[in-house]
């Protein structure tokens, strides 16, 4: 019997062969009276190990001894057995982790020490990495001042200039801006390094440089080495993990799936090799490891698993277990909280095997206790397992700060200090600065190099203070003992021979290509399931279109008696091909929206591009069978195509190939354009070229010789030829109609009349071409994703002042007046005698300022507020029986004027939910309880006028500047009686207050892409609300994402606001002592939505501390410890369980609660002689002013949106020139009917394509602005009509220019008749047609919840409009039951107008003697006398769609809160 059999025999002695059987486990527990003697167990254990030892190494490292069957897996309820770790199920993994790390805070260190101990016992060294960087420099090329603003004009001149630079004929006007300047240092293994520095100091650039990830747009010099090896000697992306500050994830995946996918791609590194060696040495030394540790290490070292135990471990230590099976979510899909998303970004890299971690601002949105726990876990890993870590944190609390061994302080791209944490204060004291007692050292370090904050820390009273520049600090550090030690160490190169062979990754990917492909296939299948609605909708849409097509080309109406009737069949075939092509259009949006995540993962070397592109192609093939099947099976017989079954299947086969070709084409365009707007325009353009040169619109003989190559490379030509030959060479058409005229069969005559090759082999040529194009486009898609970089993501422009300041700081000069800050005139704090919060202790002069406008102080009280939502489906699936999930459970409290209240609690306590309920921002769910404003019940309409709400996500119009954003808000929210000068003065004062003066002309931009930094955006959000002069302000996490200095600026703003007598409530996550003690009162909630403290903080938080310390069992606060952190730590659910208490019950029995209840009762009564809030109008400005303001903002946004406007002008011009050259001089020919068809084809193609381009490219623009509209409307700035008015009216001038450019070029080149009337009619129809298309696109966005669905809905109508336009089938040939739609189709009216205005009055006879005018009337049904009516109807369509857009915006709100 082999060894494996022996193991099985031993295991089955007790278990009857069941590897994980449950038999008897219910009553047999660890210390049960029935348990076997420990000796017997030990013997059995020894037997198992002996059997394991006999296995060959490969099998031995795959098997471990685990408890079997115990329900919770703790203890050995079902005895122990040998299990293949590769197949561990979720329950076994959870049980194993539960035994190893029951509580992450307490057990993680013990667990890691056990791992280390096992490795140390056999003398294996852990690989470590020492990172050195010497003389690193980085500078960016930027445009200075207004030339960098992305206006339509600038984008054209800058593009031309860059082309000139590349050719060397124009000078480069860009200037260089220093980002990093001559930085050198050493990052040691087994030490935690904290990277600090104000925003813009170059932290991200330094981390990217150290991780080997610097972008090509930076000029960099200097060298970075790992264990003495240069970056080119190994693969830095896999040796080091860079964790970005931007959270890019696929919203439709759960947290667990996201991390599991990442673990699968990154592989297990050298874990398996180490385990093999470990196993070998243990066997030689006869050492038996701890069974659970052995199982964990073996399971974690197995590559190619869909779920790895390591993923579960990371979920545990990051505190993500609670939301592991929740969707990550995005702006349109509800998912996890911001703090949880941040942890997912961290976890995504931690599940991999990288030994060096460079983490960029990983604590944004986390409370201080969570941050502490995560950093502590990282510290244990780094110290025990020998990792290397550099972590930049924004606002580390003192206890988190103390976890680090080394500090790097960066300012203006230079290292001010690098070395042990213990020496940093000594260094600054040597330069004359001292950190006050109740001040976190990290906060002190962030502020001490800043011009605005430095003065308060000056400690040499014998000398007058003067500003010490960064350059002076840098030179002081070089002569300081720590600086000298680093310089000496750098002088001696690292000994490469000491580098562990497994320390640096040398393979490009973490897993074999086959495994990466499999991982991507699994993910793609998952996403297709989650996005199944899109595919179902697409199939449904095709079904609808096929129903229309088959009733339009109905077989009883379809004759086979002439070449003309054959033309109608050709029309039906052409329409089918076009529909199947258009069906692939939604691939464009699906591709582009997944690209940001793809680029992130590709650059981290998760997988090569081909392993991503192949599944996105192959897995769509089964869907094609269903979609195309639906169309062909429904239409083929009903339209009456050739009745031969072979022709039927050949048509189905060809349509499948066409659909695949179209999907591949759109995926390629999406991958190459990488931006939705550009992709839409480009896709329309490609379709247009393929269609016009495809042989149906313009017959082959009519194609100009300079364009004939286009005909031969158009996929549509091959599709059209193949499908026509398949039908018209069939036996139904194999008859001679008029033998005297021609002895060719009818089918051949029809084919020849349309310039199609009348040979049967063209079916297979066409089919082969479709397959060829499919492969080509997929290959091009793969190449695009392999080599292209993400779309426009670097910062392009800076202001003159900013550049001057950067350069001056580099040279140690001082620019401008130093003492310009609010708060910079505080008295210096010698020896830390000043203890109060520096934020509160501000100049009274500041607090009295900025308030030139009066307001009424208001209080807000709420009693027994409950909020619940419908039970989510996932929870119902897990067996939860309730219909509703209660998020707030009877919360009561009050907020008063002049009192700053902090709303706190751990993640998931319901802080934002409570705030949304009180502010009236919830759009769904069930609210109960009473809310009163100064004693009167709250009415949302009036409340919006007196309140401000600063959202956590800073949503602003991207294309306006800071000053313009504030001007817009003030203009619409301040009362009408405030004149323009007072308004501007007030804005200036608010900008001073929020310290935005230096950024007044900076473009806001999109978060994470361009424009303002997180902290500047946050201050803008506050300023936008402040300029409204509200009485009550809600702020959702105003300091999240900010460093200590920025947070202090924001809190100073908040404090100044409160001191003017306003009511301010802030939710807050991880306040420093400074920030926490700037608050007057605290409203504390626990997870589950119950309050556990509401009351004053007291001096140095004394009241709060006294309350919690009076609860028996709560540990006392340590000296100098942050009360906010202590309070969150002592009130966790774990603490409640340990003490056996419920903090909300304790609070409800306290005297404090009674006092609060009395206060709420008091505030719920109106004051004598007071009256309820009343405003004569809902909005502060008249409708006309609202319209003008919205138009003003839209005007700025459009002018600065070149991806939309410059691109559409460019493409319109290109299309005009193309059409001009393709249809050159065909406008004057009217001798044959085909000449008229050609001229009409030029009109039809232009109308349809430029129209569709406008329609699709306007949608993303409106979708972005709509999210801003939701915020601004909720803030009571304007109603829906003015917004719609602004959005609609601004399109008119742009469309006018677009149509004029097109009209002049095309009219001249095609050679229509040169009379003023005809020219202006042509222009009139083009202008209004482009307008109604644009407004239709806007309407589609207004009527649908998101951009994806809008593009699908609108594309459905393109098809129907195309069909009824009068080109594919003329109106007189349309069956009577569809004739009504010819009158309802806007494109049909446009073509009517264009054809009749050009040809409706021409009396010239054609070759058969019929006057042109008569042919137009008979064949198309177009009468010249109707021209005026036609013009009216076309203009009316534009008006109708614009009105429907306004209506949709007014009635539908798709924001879910």
Swiss-Prot record:
Inducing or repressing factors: In roots. By heavy metals such as zinc (Zn), nickel (Ni) and cobalt (Co). Also induced by some phytohormones including auxin (NAA), cytokinin (BA), jasmonic acid (JA) and abscisic acid (ABA). Triggered by biotic (submergence) and abiotic stresses (ethanol, PEG), as well as by oxidative stresses mediated by antioxidants (DTT and ascorbic acid) and oxidants (hydrogen peroxide).
Chain positions recorded as ATP 1 binding sites: 197-204
Major location category of this protein: membrane
Residues that bind ATP 2: 905-912
Ranges where the ABC transmembrane type-2 domain occurs: 515-728, 1185-1399
Gene Ontology MF, one: ATP hydrolysis activity
Annotated stretches, region: Disordered: 14-43, 821-841
Coiled-coil annotated residue ranges, if any: none
CDD domains (alphabetical): ABCG_PDR_domain2
One GO location term (cellular component): membrane
Subcellular location: Membrane
Family under the similarity heading: Belongs to the ABC transporter superfamily. ABCG family. PDR (TC 3.A.1.205) subfamily.
Protein's name according to its UniProt entry: ABC transporter G family member 36
């Amino acid at each position: 019997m082999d060894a494996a059999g022996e193991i099985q025999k031993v295991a089955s002695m007790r278990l009857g062969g069941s590897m994980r059987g449950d038999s008897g486990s219910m009553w047999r527990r660890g210390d049960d009276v029935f348990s076997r003697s420990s000796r017997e167990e030990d013997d059995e254990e020894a037997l198992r190990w002996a059997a394991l030892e006999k296995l060959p190494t490969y099998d031995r490292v795959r098997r471990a001894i685990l408890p079997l069957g115990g329900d919770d897996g703790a203890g050995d309820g079902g005895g122990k057995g040998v299990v293949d770790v590769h197949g561990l199920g979720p329950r076994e993994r959870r049980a194993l982790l539960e035994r190893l790390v029951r509580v992450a805070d307490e057990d993680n260190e013990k667990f890691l020490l056990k791992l280390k101990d096992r490795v140390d016992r056999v003398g294996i060294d852990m690989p470590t990495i020492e990172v050195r960087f010497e003389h690193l420099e980085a500078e960016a090329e930027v445009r200075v001042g207004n030339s960098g603003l992305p206006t339509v004009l600038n984008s054209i001149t800058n593009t031309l200039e860059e082309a000139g630079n590349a050719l060397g004929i124009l000078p480069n006007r860009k200037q260089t801006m220093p980002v990093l300047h001559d930085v050198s240092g050493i990052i040691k293994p087994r030490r935690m390094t904290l990277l600090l520095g104000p925003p813009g100091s170059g932290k991200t650039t330094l981390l990217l440089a150290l991780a080997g990830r610097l972008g090509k747009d930076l000029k960099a010099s200097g060298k970075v080495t790992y264990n003495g090896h240069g970056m080119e000697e190994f693969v830095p992306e896999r040796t080091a993990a860079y964790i970005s500050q931007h959270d890019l994830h696929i919203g439709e995946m759960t947290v667990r799936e996201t991390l599991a996918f990442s673990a699968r791609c990154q592989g297990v590194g050298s874990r398996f090799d180490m385990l093999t060696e470990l196993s070998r040495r243990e066997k030689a030394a006869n050492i038996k490891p701890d069974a659970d540790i052995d199982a964990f290490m073996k399971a974690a070292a197995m590559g190619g698993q869909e779920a790895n135990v390591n993923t579960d471990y990371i979920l545990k230590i990051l505190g993500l277990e609670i939301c592991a099976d929740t969707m990550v979510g995005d702006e349109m899909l509800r998912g996890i909280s911001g703090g949880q998303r941040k942890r997912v970004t961290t976890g995504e890299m931690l599940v991999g095997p990288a030994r060096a971690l460079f983490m960029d601002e990983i604590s944004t949105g986390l409370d201080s206790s969570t941050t502490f726990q995560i950093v502590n876990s990282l510290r244990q890993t780094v110290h025990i397992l020998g990792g290397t870590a550099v972590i930049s944190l924004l606002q580390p609390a003192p206890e988190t700060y103390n976890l680090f061994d080394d500090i790097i302080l960066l300012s203006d791209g230079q290292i001010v200090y690098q070395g042990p944490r213990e020496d940093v204060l000594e260094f600054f004291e040597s330069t004359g600065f001292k950190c006050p007692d109740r001040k976190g050292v990290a906060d002190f370090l962030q502020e001490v190099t800043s011009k605005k904050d430095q003065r308060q820390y000056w400690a040499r009273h014998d000398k007058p203070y003067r500003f010490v520049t960064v350059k002076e600090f840098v030179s002081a550090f070089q002569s300081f003992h720590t600086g000298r030690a680093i310089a000496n160490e750098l002088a001696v190169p690292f000994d490469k021979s000491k580098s562990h062979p497994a320390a640096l990754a040398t393979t490009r990917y973490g897993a074999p290509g086959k495994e990466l492909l499999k991982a991507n296939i699994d993910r793609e299948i998952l996403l297709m399931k989650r996005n199944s609605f899109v595919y179902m909708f697409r199939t449904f849409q095709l079904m609808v279109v096929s129903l229309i097509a088959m009733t339009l080309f109905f077989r009883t109406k379809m004759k086979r008696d002439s070449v003309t009737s054959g033309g109608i069949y050709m029309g039906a075939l052409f329409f089918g091909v076009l529909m199947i092509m258009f069906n692939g259009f939604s691939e464009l949006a699906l591709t582009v929206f997944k690209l940001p995540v793809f680029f992130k993962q590709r650059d981290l070397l998760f997988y090569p591009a081909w392993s991503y592109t192949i599944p996105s192609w192959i897995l769509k093939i089964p869907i094609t069978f269903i979609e195309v099947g639906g169309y062909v099976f429904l239409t083929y017989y009903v339209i009456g195509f050739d009745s031969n079954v072979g022709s039927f299947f050949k048509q189905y086969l060809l349509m499948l190939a066409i659909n695949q070709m179209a999907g591949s084409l759109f995926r390629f365009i999406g991958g190459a354009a990488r931006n939705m707007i550009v992709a839409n325009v480009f896709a329309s353009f490609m379709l247009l070229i393929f269609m016009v040169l495809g042989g149906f619109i313009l017959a082959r003989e009519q194609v100009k010789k300079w364009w004939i190559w286009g005909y031969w490379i158009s996929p549509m030509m091959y599709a059209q030829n193949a499908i026509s030959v398949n039908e018209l060479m069939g036996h139904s058409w194999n008859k001679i109609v008029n033998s005297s005229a021609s002895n060719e069969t009818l089918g051949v005559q029809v084919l020849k009349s349309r310039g199609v090759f009348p040979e049967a082999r063209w079916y297979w040529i066409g089919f082969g071409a479709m397959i060829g194009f499919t492969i080509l486009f997929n290959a091009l898609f793969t190449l695009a994703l392999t080599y292209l970089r993400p779309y426009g993501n670097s910062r392009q422009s800076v202001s003159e002042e900013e550049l001057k300041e950067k350069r001056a700081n580099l040279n140690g000069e001082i620019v401008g007046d130093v003492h310009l800050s609010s708060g910079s005139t505080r008295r210096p704090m010698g020896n830390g005698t000043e203890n109060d919060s520096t934020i509160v202790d501000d100049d009274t002069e500041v607090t009295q300022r900025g308030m030139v406008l009066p307001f009424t102080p208001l209080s807000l009280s709420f009693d027994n507020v409950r909020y619940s939502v419908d039970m989510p489906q996932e929870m119902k699936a897990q067996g939860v029986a309730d219909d509703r999930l209660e998020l707030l459970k009877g919360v009561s409290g009050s907020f008063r004027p002049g009192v700053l209240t902090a709303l706190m609690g751990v993640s998931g306590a319901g802080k934002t939910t409570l705030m949304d309920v009180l502010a009236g921002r919830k759009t769904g769910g069930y609210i109960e309880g009473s809310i009163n404003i100064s004693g009167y019940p709250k009415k949302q309409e009036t409340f919006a006028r007196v309140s401000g709400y600063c959202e956590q996500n800073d949503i602003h119009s991207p294309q306006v500047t800071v000053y313009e954003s504030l001007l817009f808000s003030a203009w619409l929210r301040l009362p009408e009686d405030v004149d323009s000068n007072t308004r501007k003065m007030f804005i200036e004062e608010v900008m001073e207050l929020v310290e935005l003066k230096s950024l007044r002309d900076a473009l806001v931009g999109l978060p994470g892409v361009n424009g303002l930094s997180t902290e500047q955006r946050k201050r803008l959000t506050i300023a936008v609300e402040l300029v409204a002069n509200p009485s009550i302000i809600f702020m959702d996490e105003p300091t999240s994402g900010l460093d200590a200095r920025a947070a202090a600026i924001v809190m100073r703003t908040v404090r100044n606001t409160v001191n003017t007598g306003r009511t301010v409530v802030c939710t807050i996550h991880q306040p420093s002592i400074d920030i926490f003690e700037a608050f007057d009162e605290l409203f504390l909630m626990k997870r589950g939505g119950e309050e556990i403290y509401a009351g004053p903080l007291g001096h140095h938080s004394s009241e709060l501390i006294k309350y919690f310390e009076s609860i028996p069992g709560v540990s006392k606060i340590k000296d100098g410890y942050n009360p906010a952190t202590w309070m969150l730590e002592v009130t966790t659910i774990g603490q409640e369980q340990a003490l056996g208490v419920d903090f909300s019950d304790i609070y409800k029995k306290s005297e404090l609660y009674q006092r609060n209840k009395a206060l709420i009762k008091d505030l719920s009564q109106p004051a004598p002689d007071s009256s309820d809030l009343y405003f004569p109008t809902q909005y502060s400005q008249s409708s006309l002013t609202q319209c003008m303001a919205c138009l003003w903002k839209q005007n700025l946004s459009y002018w600065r949106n070149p991806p939309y406007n410059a691109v559409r002008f460019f493409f319109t011009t290109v299309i005009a020139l193309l059409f001009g050259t393709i249809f050159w001089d065909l406008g004057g020919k009217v001798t044959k009917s085909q000449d008229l068809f050609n001229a009409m084809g030029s009109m039809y193609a232009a109308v349809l394509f430029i129209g569709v381009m406008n329609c699709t490219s306007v949608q993303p623009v409106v979708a972005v602005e709509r999210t801003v509209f939701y915020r601004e409307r909720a803030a009571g700035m304007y109603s829906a009509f003015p917004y719609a008015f602004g959005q609609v009216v601004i399109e008119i001038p742009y469309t006018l220019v677009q149509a004029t450019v097109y009209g002049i070029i095309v009219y001249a080149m095609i050679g229509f008749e040169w009379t003023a009337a005809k020219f202006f009619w042509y222009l009139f129809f083009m202008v209004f047609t482009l307008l109604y298309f644009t407004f239709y696109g806007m309407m589609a966005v207004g009527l649908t919840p998101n951009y994806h669905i809008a593009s699908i809905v609108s594309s459905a109508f393109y098809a129907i409009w195309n069909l009824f336009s009068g080109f594919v089938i003329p109106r007189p040939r349309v069956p009577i039951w569809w004739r009504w739609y010819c009158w309802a189709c806007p494109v049909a009216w446009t073509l009517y107008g264009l054809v009749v205005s050009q040809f409706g009055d021409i009396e010239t006879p054609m070759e058969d003697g019929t006057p042109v005018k008569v042919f137009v009337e008979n064949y198309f049904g177009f009468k010249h006398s109707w021209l005026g009516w036609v013009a009216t109807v076309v203009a009316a369509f534009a008006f109708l769609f614009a009105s429907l857009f306004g209506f949709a915006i007014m009635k539908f709100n798709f924001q879910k809160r």
